[in-house]
Amino acid sequence: MERRKKQNEGLLSVYPPPPWYSRYFTDENVAKVKDLQSSDNSQLLEAPLKYLTPPSPPEAGAYHNFGDVWQVNDKLATLEDLGITQVYDGAAIRGEGQESGARVLELKKLTKSLLLAFVELTGIMGVSPEQFPAKFEHVRVLLINIHHILNEYRPHQARESLVTLMQQQINDKKQHVENIRQSCDKVRDTIRVLSKQFDQVDEFEETGGVTTEEVKYVSGKDKDLLVVKMAEQVL
């Protein structure tokens, strides 16, 4: 009993200690597991070697994780399953109500009821404090009902969040494609300009102007002037 209590305290701590079966993870056992896995030996299921292989994922029921119980098929429990009184009209927000404003209307009603209950609670505390537990329980039930309706929106919120994320990724990819297209256009324009300049150089040399061969035989200041002259005629 004492051992189980310590294990539960460890599971609920911020940094839980290593599980009790961690002592079986020795070099010798790890080597045995590798040999058995390679030979498909059924002795692998025997203790303590079975603790060295991860269990198969659960397909149904519940599982424990850090001291809490989680359902494999996660679904929102009803207020009746939780033992909470349902104060809103459940039939109005199901079926056709999912597409209408029934949920919003019920939330507004519950919010107004919560404000009224809080005002009554503050008044009771000054006049009749012994009625505090009943009124406080009423406030608690109203809050749980509000949260339950909001939690029913979670699947819709998840779908819309996924749609928004995917749309953002599509927009980013389109923007990247557009940036690449603009860069390609700039490269084409640059190549076109350079091609025209080379054509002008060829035409310049064919007409008997100052050529690069003539520049080789000129030195000093005269050479600089000839280069400037060539650049001006090309541009």
Swiss-Prot record:
Its main location: nucleus. Keywords: Activator, Nucleus, Transcription, Transcription regulation. It comes from the Eukaryota. GO terms for biological process: negative regulation of transcription by RNA polymerase II; positive regulation of transcription elongation by RNA polymerase II; positive regulation of transcription initiation by RNA polymerase II; regulation of transcription by RNA polymerase II; RNA polymerase II preinitiation complex assembly. It is found in: Nucleus. Transmembrane segments: none annotated. GO terms for molecular function: transcription coactivator activity. InterPro entries: Med7/Med21-like, Mediatior_Med7, Mediatior_Med7_sf. GO terms for cellular component: core mediator complex; mediator complex. The keyword Repressor does not apply. Component of the Mediator complex. Component of the Mediator complex, a coactivator involved in the regulated transcription of nearly all RNA polymerase II-dependent genes. Mediator functions as a bridge to convey information from gene-specific regulatory proteins to the basal RNA polymerase II transcription machinery. Mediator is recruited to promoters by direct interactions with regulatory proteins and serves as a scaffold for the assembly of a functional preinitiation complex with RNA polymerase II and the general transcription factors. Belongs to the Mediator complex subunit 7 family. This is Mediator of RNA polymerase II transcription subunit 7. It comes from Yarrowia lipolytica (strain CLIB 122 / E 150) (Yeast). The lineage of its organism: Eukaryota, Fungi, Dikarya, Ascomycota, Saccharomycotina.
